[in-house]
Amino acid sequence: MERFSLRFVLMMVSIILTSSICQAQLSPTFYDQSCRNALSKIRSSVRTAIARERRMAASLIRMHFHDCFVHGCDASILLEGTSTIESERDALPNFKSVRGFEVIDKAKSEVEKVCPGIVSCADIIAVAARDASEYVGGPKWAVKVGRRDSTAAFKALANSGELPGFKDTLDQLSGLFSKKGLNTRDLVALSGAHTIGQSQCFLFRDRLYENSSDIDAGFASTRKRRCPTVGGDGNLAALDLVTPNSFDNNYYKNLMQKKGLLVTDQVLFGSGASTDGIVSEYSKNRSKFAADFATAMIKMGNIEPLTGSNGEIRKICSFVN
């Protein structure tokens, strides 16, 4: 029995040490010697893309989220389908929804010109999300880099509840985020990414027409113009009508007025849960929201990264080597 206990303790120590080593291998200075121009190349590609289409900022932040929540931040979301790979792009939460792949491809090609085989696609996604936030007036943070790319995709996992559903309850959202090592404040802060971007009609139609007490009547009436009861499933609507292209704290002010577009937005405020206080705090203090958003993005970027000799550095982000 004592021998078994000792083996168990040693095994747990090994797991903890391995986890610590993985985190230690991620560093903001990871490419300082091997590819010092990497981050500037990525930044240039991102800024060019958002200057062309403002909506792309939200898309790049969302891509990072959808990558990290399915099997960790490993760029598995970028892989196209082949005879041996079922692409996450085709999973229900991502299909014709996640976008910005061409921006990542462009950034990768620019980096490859100066540092071939050095910078991972997973790191490019993470850096692009930060640069997108900064470009539209949001916070900037030091991205920890050193991730490697997966050699597989995880479509079945993406379809199995690893990503939030558009009708999830607060308890479901909190449970999902907790499973990823993120707390309630992280949930509310990361949801603030919906201060920019757009959503498709079919994702919020039911909320508009259910005549619920948690939606402002005037807001619902305005939104119905672009989202009829039948048809128009793909019609786009700004998540924040007031400042749709600026990364500010207006999203939280909207929630307090029952003007959250998605069910998963509005569940953050109005039920008397602990999230109410956080939403109220962010609505009054943009700087606090920005700081907490940056902290949460760093934490999210540390979800199960591949490091060391695990995975690979893809030559082309959409295919394994």
From Swiss-Prot:
GO terms, biological process: cellular response to hypoxia; hydrogen peroxide catabolic process; response to oxidative stress
Reactions catalysed according to its record: 2 a phenolic donor + H2O2 = 2 a phenolic radical donor + 2 H2O
Alphabetized InterPro entries for the sequence: Haem_peroxidase (IPR002016), Haem_peroxidase_sf (IPR010255), Peroxidase_pln (IPR000823), Peroxidases_AS (IPR019794), Peroxidases_heam-ligand_BS (IPR019793), Secretory_peroxidase (IPR033905)
Cofactor section: heme b; Ca(2+)
Keywords annotated in UniProt: Calcium, Disulfide bond, Glycoprotein, Heme, Iron, Metal-binding, Oxidoreductase, Peroxidase, Pyrrolidone carboxylic acid, Secreted, Signal
Example GO molecular function: metal ion binding
Any one GO CC term of the record: extracellular region
Top-level taxon of origin: Eukaryota
Disulfide feature: 35-115, 68-73, 121-317, 201-227
Listed PROSITE patterns: PEROXIDASE_1, PEROXIDASE_2, PEROXIDASE_4
Note: There are 73 peroxidase genes in A.thaliana.
Record protein name field: Peroxidase 5
Source species of the chain: Arabidopsis thaliana (Mouse-ear cress)
Native organism taxonomy: Eukaryota, Viridiplantae, Streptophyta, Embryophyta, Tracheophyta
